[in-house]
């Protein structure tokens, strides 16, 4: 347990930031899941919008320091490959 005033404050700040980061990650995972579901259904009209949403959420997570930029780049690349495969099929 923290003894100093600043350490006690940091415990509160860390708890708050952790909650915000969990919300951001959850929102991003949901966007990715929605995109994958649309790809599986074969809906070519909505797949572009879903991809933009997922990509935007991933970039926001990178900018806020929630996930590493290489992780986001890898996920975006793999999702983009799936979208392209659907569009050409």
Curated annotation (Swiss-Prot):
<dbReference type="GO" id="GO:0070181">
    <property type="term" value="F:small ribosomal subunit rRNA binding"/>
</dbReference>
<protein>
    <recommendedName>
        <fullName>Small ribosomal subunit protein bS20</fullName>
    </recommendedName>
</protein>
<comment type="similarity">
    <text>Belongs to the bacterial ribosomal protein bS20 family.</text>
</comment>
<dbReference type="Pfam" id="PF01649">
    <property type="entry name" value="Ribosomal_S20p"/>
</dbReference>
<keyword id="KW-0699">rRNA-binding</keyword>
<dbReference type="GO" id="GO:0005829">
    <property type="term" value="C:cytosol"/>
</dbReference>
<comment type="function">
    <text>Binds directly to 16S ribosomal RNA.</text>
</comment>
<dbReference type="GO" id="GO:0003735">
    <property type="term" value="F:structural constituent of ribosome"/>
</dbReference>
<dbReference type="GO" id="GO:0006412">
    <property type="term" value="P:translation"/>
</dbReference>
<keyword id="KW-0687">Ribonucleoprotein</keyword>
<dbReference type="GO" id="GO:0015935">
    <property type="term" value="C:small ribosomal subunit"/>
</dbReference>
<dbReference type="InterPro" id="IPR002583">
    <property type="entry name" value="Ribosomal_bS20"/>
</dbReference>
<keyword id="KW-0689">Ribosomal protein</keyword>
<dbReference type="InterPro" id="IPR036510">
    <property type="entry name" value="Ribosomal_bS20_sf"/>
</dbReference>
<keyword id="KW-0694">RNA-binding</keyword>
């Amino acid at each position: 347990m923290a003894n100093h005033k600043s350490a006690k404050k940091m415990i509160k700040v860390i708890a708050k930031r952790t909650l915000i980061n969990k919300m951001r990650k959850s929102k991003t995972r949901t966007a990715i899941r929605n995109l994958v579901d649309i790809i599986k259904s074969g809906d070519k009209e909505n797949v572009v919008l879903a991809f933009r949403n997922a990509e935007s959420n991933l970039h926001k997570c990178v900018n806020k320091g929630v996930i590493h930029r290489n992780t986001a780049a890898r996920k975006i690349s793999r999702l983009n490959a799936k979208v392209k495969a659907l569009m050409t099929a």
